[in-house]
């Protein structure tokens, strides 16, 4: 599981929005942490907020790039984030998806459930709350846009966008609400400063990457994780 935290800084409102991992895996932790975060904000910096919590249940074939060990009930998970008005993101960042995987029952049921989550009750926190999907595969991107249009999409860091021009091309796509570039672009301030405000607002930075800066195998590692933890498990059933 990649436990990276990303932050989106909005210049017109100087607040750092952190996107936390372990939506399913750390469910029991969030049951304790979220009430604490809401009731005792004096324990935390006033310039930070929770932008979303992301993850996928164990054994999701659309998952990818990281191993998942979450076994919590999706309805319980959804109830928790909805109660606190937090966007939930499904980590469906598989890079080796094939056409036959699109009909997977479990993943489609999750998308349907998360797409309509804010319609389930009249809690004031759920007003205009929207959930999303972190995606890598263009095949899956097109499928989600067609079948689950109310889920917003995030371009996954598993694409390993290290070239700044490629990153800008991704930023300018209307398909994505947010883009997570490779961590090696985090400090190219001279280029980041030249971006428009609209472009800047779409960027989320990976803050605690475990790879060393000169790693040349990061993309291959993500693909290996997909092959061994997702595709192979499903193909051997």
Model features per residue range: what roles?
Residues 229-236:
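Conserved small/polar residues in nucleotide/adenosyl-binding loops
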Residues 96-98, 176-186:
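Conserved strand-turn element in the central/C-terminal portion of the radical SAM core barrel
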Residues 147-153, 171-179, 198-203:
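Glycine-enriched alpha-helix->loop->beta-strand junction motifs that scaffold or abut catalytic
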Residues 24-26, 181-193, 206-223:
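Active-site glycine- and acidic-residue-rich loops that bind
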Residues 2-49:
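N-terminal basic/disordered segments at the start of proteins
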Residues 22-30, 51-147, 152-162:
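Active-site beta->alpha loop and helix N-cap motifs at the rims of alpha/beta catalytic domains
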Residues 29-37, 101-107, 142-148, 164-172, ...:
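Distinct, well-ordered alpha-helical segments
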Residues 71, 138-144, 186-198:
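Active-site-adjacent beta->alpha loops and helix N-cap segments on the catalytic face
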